[in-house]
From Swiss-Prot:
Pfam families: LysM. This is Cell division suppressor protein YneA. Inhibits cell division during the SOS response. Affects a later stage of the cell division protein assembly, after the assembly of the Z ring, by probably suppressing recruitment of FtsL and/or DivIC to the division machinery. GO terms for biological process: division septum assembly; DNA repair; negative regulation of cell division; SOS response. The keyword Cell cycle applies. CDD domains: LysM. It comes from Geobacillus thermodenitrificans (strain NG80-2).
């Protein structure tokens, strides 16, 4: 009886942790915290990932996936003039981020 109760308790705790994880993972991010860039002619997500690499700490694939998901882009192709949010916190944009264009 005590073993069964212990198993139910452990199962309930694990289920609660999984549910909290799902809720946290599906929470929308606050785009206002992140940098917005205007896409220039010839820009690619791969190039932007490399350009801002010191500030975001993601692999190029993770960067691209983040940008496509957060901006709800239909593909990874960019259009000159469009504005996209990138995974660089505005707090990291303190003037120390030098970017070559």
């Amino acid at each position: 009886m005590k073993k069964t109760l212990l198993h139910y308790l452990i199962f309930s705790c694990l289920l609660a942790l999984v549910l909290v994880g799902f809720v946290y993972a599906s929470s929308p991010i606050d785009k206002k915290q992140y940098m917005t860039v205007t896409v220039a002619s010839g820009d690619t997500l791969w190039g932007l990932a490399k350009q801002y690499e010191p500030a975001h700490g993601l692999s190029p694939d993770e960067f691209i996936r983040w940008v496509v998901d957060v901006n709800r882009l239909p593909s990874s192709r960019l259009t000159a003039g469009e504005q996209i949010v990138i995974p660089v916190l505005k707090s990291k944009q303190d003037g120390s981020l030098a970017v070559k264009r």
